[in-house]
């Protein structure tokens, strides 16, 4: 009987791996370094070795393993193929990951998903949106990632770009260039790096306005802390950031009408100083029937990816 499954969240520094029961119970989790040398040529064999090593340690036969799910930091086609180069994996990409890894594992079934989409799948299965059929997750970290789940299914899109929420255009007059090459992407305003960039711009534009952050090296967390403590200029940046994000979420709500929005990533740890104005701005922009859509913190944290990867395997 196939009672077990593995979930892998492949990142640029480490791969997080979880051994699960097919019911969703996490039995054990660990990490292995991601070897990005030589365009990541050893990545898949290292993942295979990690899974096989754990199977040997636990005395598991292939016949007991339902499959291995993998979340990767790039577009995925047909739950199998990574069609482009992934920059933060040393140029690794253009692989039929499912086929290649399955062969290395002696035929164990492998399915692959974009890491942000997979994290959303984890949250809707065992996290903040448990019990929902449709939900959208936004991850606010160094960039802005996203995952869209409709009727229990990840929306990958024709080109594997479904859920690229961070690259919704929110300011067509922006002159600064996003990492994707476009101008005015949500990521430029609502990511951790975007908050810092915009805060520095506010400081430059308001040289006579007192601010506790002036003359310091600060991170996004410091901006939210300053706003919480009554700093008017930091509060202005938080208001502008949440206004932009609220507008983007309202656009998504009018497109897919989810039961819930989940917000994760390091920026989400700011708490209500982020969520309270975000909900208010969302209501201003949202279509009337969507205005009360809940916007809540994601709860699985760094484990969302391994949960979602396993969900690819165990399905309904």
Task: List each language-model region with its residue ranges.
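ATP-binding/phosphotransfer module of carbohydrate and carboxylate kinases, centering on a glycine-rich
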Residues: 1-67, 76-82, 101-108, 122-132, ...
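Short beta-strand segments
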Residues: 9, 69-73, 113, 137-143, ...
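A charged helix-plus-loop insertion that forms the helical arch/lid used to bind
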Residues: 81-93
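Short gly/Ser/Thr-rich phosphate-binding loop of adenylate-forming enzymes
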Residues: 95-101
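A glycine-rich, Thr/Ser-enriched phosphate-binding loop motif common to dinucleotide/cofactor-binding enzymes
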Residues: 112-121
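Adenylate-forming
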Residues: 120-125, 146-148, 167-168
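A short alpha->loop->secondary-structure connector
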Residues: 157-158
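Structural signature of FAD isoalloxazine-binding scaffolds in flavoprotein oxidoreductases
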Residues: 161-165
